[in-house]
Amino acid sequence: GVIVQSGNDAAVVIAEGISGTEDNFAAEMNMTAAKLGMKNTTFTNSTGWPDPELTTTAHDLALLSTAIIKNFPANKFPELYPIFKKKTYTLNGIKQGNRNPLLYGKSSQSKGVDGLKTGYTSESGYGLVASAERGGQRVIMVLNGMNSKKERSAESRRLLDFIFREYKNYEFFKSGEVIDKAEVWLGDVHHVSLV
């Protein structure tokens, strides 16, 4: 319900099940947000529904998305992350469709898309936090302020195609690889490695 269909009722049930109350859950979300470096985010509920004190930014949502993607395979429930890319989900005989427009359409446009979440509020419009991986390159895109589902769909496709067409990852050095040495004046050693 929460991931595929954006079920706010399911979000509240999960929050209350984990933390007892939605307020307690929001407090835990804020602690996690701080640990992730989400400096411009204050959660007040589990759904993201408008609240004068609820704030976040596209950058902070990208930080959260990165943490979700990095931590799912390593945690004890690796089977959960693939749910983000399910087009439909059936529970108790009720079939629910995923609202992420990037999962649908030509296979070239949806290639590598594996998440994450759509949203809508009257204040911020239609939004999407999307994730895709092609050829070993991972892209996380945060889009907000669209006027309709149709505009969200078209703009997210346009941006994702542009990003994969125009941006590439280049590895100049491997992590931990010694690039050079620097001289140390008056030290116990004469040189230190630059990595």
Predicted regions and their residues:
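Second-shell loop/turn segments in exported
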Residues: 1, 11-20, 47-53, 118, ...
